[in-house]
A protein has these predicted regions:
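A short N-terminal helical cap/helix-turn-helix that marks the beginning
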Residues: 13-35, 54
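Conserved AMP-binding/adenylate-forming core of the ANL superfamily
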Residues: 35-89, 106-111
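Flexible, non-catalytic linker and terminal segments flanking ANL/adenylate-forming cores
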Residues: 1-18, 38
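Proline-centered helix-kink/hinge sites
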Residues: 30, 79, 98-100
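Flexible, glycine- and charge-enriched loops at secondary-structure boundaries
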Residues: 11, 45, 49, 100
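Structural core segment of the AMP-binding/adenylate-forming
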Residues: 66, 93-154
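Aromatic/hydrophobic pocket-lining residues that form π-stacking "cages" and hydrophobic walls in ligand
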Residues: 22, 87, 133
Length: 154
């Protein structure tokens, strides 16, 4: 097998991680709109970098208070939406690892993903996603914590 080595284009500090990206963004431009969320009246509401960081930290603190520890794996069954990004950063801030599971996965596939990863918790988006997970929950003794986005658990 042929191996090719290339020098890094950008030097990365061995002490930095992905959470630093958000902290750096807030330091540089806290009022910059990072996201826009649809409102019930059809309008859109901006979420600034500082607001997003506040939400991330609050959610990360909630995960830690619920017993999530560094290195824990948390499954996520969810379509692409704002809360996914919020969860990504909150899980990283808590030192845990997010295990994405396709929102179209069958109960068998959900079982494999959560079992193979060693997930100890699951976040589902909808009641239907939770129902598919619940079909195999008894076979996943490590998964002791469950949250649902649409139910407002987060």
């Amino acid at each position: 097998m042929q191996q090719i080595d290339m020098p890094a284009v950008v030097a990365a500090s061995p002490d930095s991680n992905v959470t630093d990206l958000l902290i750096d963004r807030v330091t540089l431009s806290p009022d910059l709109a990072l996201f826009a969320l649809p409102q019930a009246d059809g309008s859109w509401k901006d979420v600034t970098a500082a607001e997003f960081l506040d939400q991330v930290r609050a959610l990360a603190k909630g995960l830690v208070a619920a017993g999530i520890q560094p290195g824990d794996k948390i499954g996520l069954i969810c379509r692409t939406r704002y809360e996914w990004t919020l969860l990504d950063f909150a899980v990283w801030f808590a030192g845990a690892i997010l295990v994405p599971v396709y929102d179209t996965s069958s109960p068998h596939q959900i079982h494999f993903d959560l079992s193979d990863s060693g997930a100890i918790a699951i976040i589902t988006e909808t009641a239907e996603h939770y129902a598919r997970f619940d079909e195999v929950h008894a076979e996943l003794p490590l998964v002791s914590k469950t949250w649902n986005i649409d139910r407002g658990d987060l």
